[in-house]
């Protein structure tokens, strides 16, 4: 097998999602090109991609996630990517969704070039993941259009992979689909738990944004602090970080704010002093697995979980945490050191069995062998 392949991500998720597809295609002797925009959608500034051979597509900058400028930027990316593909004429296309404009453009390209193999990888279910509220109600007509752009385009793909099985169920995907979980490398240092006995130590890891459920986290802290003193380690940052710190402190937690930490050994050191990781999002958020969950498991930290579907099943099957419910505070305050260590052991095993780069690479390789074998 040999040919040309294009991998596409508007928001530059090469490391999180596309690296495995790139490796798999190269193993099948495809030459690959990676296409992304020249605008960082998180920091809202232009950037230079460091992936070797990357082709960056110029788009209009924007500052607000809900704005006409963002819609225009995503539309430009979809149109300019398609124009590039007309010149490049690849044999295989792997595209991350959203943006949903990209799904529509690539579906049209597939109909025009039926011999190309098209794979959609859905890493976010937009607009379903938008937190509920007045804005979602007001924007529901627009959101329906956005969802239609994606849903009407999926049948054009030869294969659809999703971030979690929950997305497959919601989209009613069939046999030509499969969940491909987030991949991560094992931590470079061993976990050496040193859990405090005089207080309950919790960890929050990740972005502090509008989808985390600060009120429910604070309710948990408030209930637990009636039984034991509570310390909260925050590893991350975001637009709501001060609100989170203030609310957790008011609820009774001794808050230690570490800011964002990218060094795995440093994160391991902090988590070795924590009993549980917080995996609590707003109920309206449509997601079955978070990157923070994988990172908690990577470090051997059991979780307090409100996420349904995939993550809930992992808790039930492997005993790697406690579900967020009315008895949650009492449960986490009464769990013994031995029980916590057993959960930590299980969390590490789950990571090694389901989320290492080796495991995810095998999944991707199986998909590629099936989808491109006829080329």
Residue ranges and their predicted role:
Residues 184, 193-212, 217-222, 232-233:
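Conserved donor-binding/catalytic core segment of Leloir-type glycosyltransferases
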Residues 212, 258, 263-269, 277-295, ...:
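Nucleotide-sugar-dependent
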